From Swiss-Prot:
Gene: nuoK
Name recorded for this polypeptide: NADH-quinone oxidoreductase subunit K
Membrane topology listed for this record: Multi-pass membrane protein
Superkingdom of the source species: Bacteria
InterPro entries: NADH_UbQ_OxRdtase_chain4L/K, NUOK/Mnh_C1-like
Organism: Bartonella quintana (strain Toulouse)
The keyword Chloroplast belongs to this UniProt entry's keyword annotation: no
Subcellular location: Cell inner membrane
C-alpha cells in the first residue's frame, strides 16, 4: 500500500476537525481550549510538511519548525498565565476571566 498526499490531508483534516470541535463543544475549560488550539496548529503543520514533501521543497518544513516554536512559546505562556490566574482566583473557568479587568 502506497501512502500519498491524500492520506496526510485526510488525517490533517480529521485533526483540525477534532480541534475545532474541542473549542466549540467545551467552552468552559481554558486548558481544553488551549489543547484544541494546539491540535489545530498541529494539523496545519502536517499540511505544510505533506505539501513540502510532495513538491520536494524545504520551505514548508522550515515554516513548520517556526510554527512549532511559536506554538511551544504560546503554550508555555498560556499555561503560566493560567497558573497565576488559578492562584489568584481558585478557578480556571472561562466565565471567571472577566475578573481580570481593572
Amino acid at each position: 500500500m502506497h501512502i500519498d498526499i491524500t492520506h496526510y490531508l485526510i488525517v490533517s483534516a480529521l485533526i483540525f476537525t477534532i480541534g475545532i470541535a474541542g473549542i466549540f463543544l467545551n467552552r468552559k475549560n481554558v486548558i481544553i481550549i488551549l489543547m484544541s488550539i494546539e491540535l489545530i496548529l498541529l494539523s496545519v503543520n502536517l499540511n505544510f510538511v505533506a505539501f513540502s514533501a510532495f513538491f520536494q521543497d524545504l520551505v514548508g518544513q522550515i515554516f513548520a519548525l517556526f510554527i512549532l516554536t511559536v506554538a511551544a512559546a504560546e503554550a508555555a505562556i498560556g499555561l503560566a498565565i493560567l497558573v497565576v490566574f488559578f492562584r489568584n482566583c481558585g478557578s480556571i473557568a472561562v466565565e471567571d476571566v472577566n475578573v481580570m479587568k481593572g
